[in-house]
C-alpha cells in the first residue's frame, strides 16, 4: 500500500514479467505506476511489498542485482563521466556506441553536458545493456526523438529475447509496438488487458 | 566491485555531507592541536552527530528522488549508502584527531 497523507495511491499492485517477453503497464497520470516501481525497487517505504523470481523471494537489499530499473527522472550523478558509469555497470561503452553512434563523442562527457533526450538514451542504454534477468523501464520514450524511439524499441526487443522487461509509458503507440502483454493500473489496482475495451473500461482510453 | 569503486560511489552519493563533515573535522583537529581534554572528544562527537543529522535532513528536502536508483541498480540499498557515508565521515574524524594527538601528543 502506498499512501501520501490521506490519499491512497496504490492498494493492490501486482505485475509479472516473463523471460522472453515485454510487459507493458498503462495508467493515467497519478495512477501509481512509478510509485509501484519505486516501492518494488526499495526507493519508497511501503507496507507489504513482495518480489519473487521463480517463486523464490528476492533479497530487497540487493534487488538491483536481479532487477535493473530506469526511473522516470535522472538517476546518474550529474558530474560522473558516461564512460565511468558504464564501467561501474559492467557495460562496454563501445557496444552502446554501436547502437547509438552519436555517443562516440560523449565518452568523456558528464551527464550535465548532455541534453535531456541525450541523457535519457544514455541512461536507458546503461540499464538495458547491464546484466540482470529483469528490467523495469519507467517512461523510456519520454524526451526521445522519433528516430531514437525506433532504436530504443529495437534494443528493447533484442534484450527481451533472453530477459524479462516491464515498460510503462504514456506513448501508447510506442509501448504497443514492443509489448507482448499489457496491464492497466486504475483506482489503486492493476488488471490485465486483453482488449482495447479493457482500457476503455478502466478509463485509460475513450 | 572493488573497494576503490565503493569509496568512489560513497563519495558520489554523500558528497555534500562529506564536505561539510570534513570542514567540521578540520576545525576539530585545529582546536585539538591547541589544547587537549577528555571532554573535548565527547563534545566533538556529540556536535558532529547533531550536524550530521541536520545536514541529512536538509539534503533529503532537496535531493533528486531518482538518484538513489543508480546505486540500487548496483545492488547497494539506500541503507547501505547512508551507512557508508556515515562510516567514512566519522572515520575521517577519528583518523584526523588521532593524527593530531600523535603529532602534538
Predicted features along the sequence, with ranges:
Chain A
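Q-loop/switch helix immediately C-terminal to the Walker
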Residues: 69, 73, 78-93
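Walker B catalytic motif
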Residues: 139-140
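Conserved ABC ATPase signature
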Residues: 110-114, 118
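Conserved ABC transporter NBD signature motif
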Residues: 46-65
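Helix-to-loop junction immediately C-terminal to a conserved catalytic motif
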Residues: 41
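The feature captures the beta-strand-to-loop junction immediately N-terminal to the Walker
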Residues: 26-28
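Conserved beta-strand-loop-alpha-helix hinge in the C-terminal portion
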Residues: 189-206
Amino acid at each position: 500500500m502506498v499512501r501520501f497523507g490521506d490519499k491512497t495511491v496504490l492498494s493492490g499492485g501486482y505485475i509479472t514479467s516473463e523471460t522472453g517477453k515485454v510487459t507493458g503497464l498503462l495508467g493515467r497520470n497519478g495512477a501509481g505506476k512509478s510509485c509501484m516501481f519505486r516501492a518494488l525497487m526499495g526507493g519508497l517505504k511501503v507496507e507489504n511489498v513482495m518480489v519473487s523470481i521463480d517463486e523464490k523471494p528476492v533479497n530487497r537489499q540487493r534487488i538491483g542485482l536481479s532487477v535493473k530499473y530506469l526511473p522516470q527522472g535522472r538517476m546518474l550523478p550529474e558530474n560522473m563521466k558516461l564512460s565511468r558509469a558504464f564501467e561501474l555497470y559492467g557495460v562496454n561503452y563501445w557496444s552502446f556506441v554501436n547502437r547509438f553512434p552519436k555517443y562516440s563523442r560523449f565518452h568523456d562527457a558528464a551527464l550535465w553536458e548532455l541534453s535531456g533526450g541525450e541523457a535519457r538514451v544514455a541512461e536507458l542504454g546503461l540499464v538495458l545493456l547491464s546484466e540482470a534477468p529483469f528490467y523495469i523501464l519507467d517512461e523510456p520514450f519520454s524526451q526521445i526523438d522519433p528516430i531514437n524511439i525506433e532504436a530504443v524499441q529495437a534494443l528493447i526487443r533484442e534484450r527481451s529475447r533472453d530477459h524479462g522487461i516491464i515498460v510503462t509509458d504514456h506513448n501508447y503507440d510506442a509501448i504497443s509496438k514492443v509489448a507482448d502483454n499489457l496491464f492497466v493500473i486504475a483506482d489503486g489496482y492493476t488488471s490485465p488487458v486483453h482488449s482495447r475495451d479493457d482500457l476503455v473500461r478502466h478509463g485509460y482510453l475513450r | 566491485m572493488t573497494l576503490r569503486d565503493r569509496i568512489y560511489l560513497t563519495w558520489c552519493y554523500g558528497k555534500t555531507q562529506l564536505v561539510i563533515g570534513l570542514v567540521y573535522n578540520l576545525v576539530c583537529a585545529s582546536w585539538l592541536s591547541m589544547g587537549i581534554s577528555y571532554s573535548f572528544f565527547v563534545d566533538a562527537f556529540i556536535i558532529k552527530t547533531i550536524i550530521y543529522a541536520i545536514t541529512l535532513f536538509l539534503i533529503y528536502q532537496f535531493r533528486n528522488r531518482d538518484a538513489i536508483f543508480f546505486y540500487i541498480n548496483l545492488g547497494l540499498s539506500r541503507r547501505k549508502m547512508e551507512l557508508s557515508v556515515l562510516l567514512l565521515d566519522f572515520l575521517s574524524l577519528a583518523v584526523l584527531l588521532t593524527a593530531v594527538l600523535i603529532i602534538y601528543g
